[in-house]
């Protein structure tokens, strides 16, 4: 699957704000726009409820961006569009970095890993009356 647009890094995606005298993190306008763009482009597949692996090719506008800064944003977007149940179930990420000044994007594949926990989670959600995609 391909998602077009420059992935904001974690460090550029959040800003510190003060709420009732305490510091907190808030999403930047750039990150909010990227999440909305990701959701519009994402083609729905069955939701992965347990462990998974991801292969991702990241095409940045320049060589200045780094891979590790984009993983949180990418996994959070997958969770937000309900491609995955929770990013904590990510067991492996295989990533490659490229530069494409004119067409920044993500190209990725998500694989469910074979585990019995997967079926346990599905059955638990069904028992709780939650909708589960098959």
Walk through the language-model features, giving the residues of each.
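Acidic, proline/glycine-enriched N-terminal capping motif
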Residues: 1-134
């Amino acid at each position: 699957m391909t998602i077009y647009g420059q992935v904001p890094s974690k460090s550029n995606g959040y800003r510190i704000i003060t709420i009732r005298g305490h510091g907190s993190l808030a999403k930047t306008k750039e990150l909010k726009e990227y999440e909305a763009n990701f959701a519009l482009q994402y083609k729905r597949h069955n939701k992965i409820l347990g462990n998974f692996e991801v292969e991702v090719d990241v095409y940045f506008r320049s060589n200045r961006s780094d891979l590790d800064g984009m993983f949180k944003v990418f996994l959070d977007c997958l969770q937000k569009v309900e491609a995955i149940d929770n990013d904590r179930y990510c067991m492996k990420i295989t990533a490659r970095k490229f530069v494409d000044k004119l067409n920044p994007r993500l190209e990725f594949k998500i694989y469910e890993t074979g585990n019995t926990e997967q079926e346990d989670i599905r059955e638990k959600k069904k028992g709780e009356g939650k909708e589960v995609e098959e």
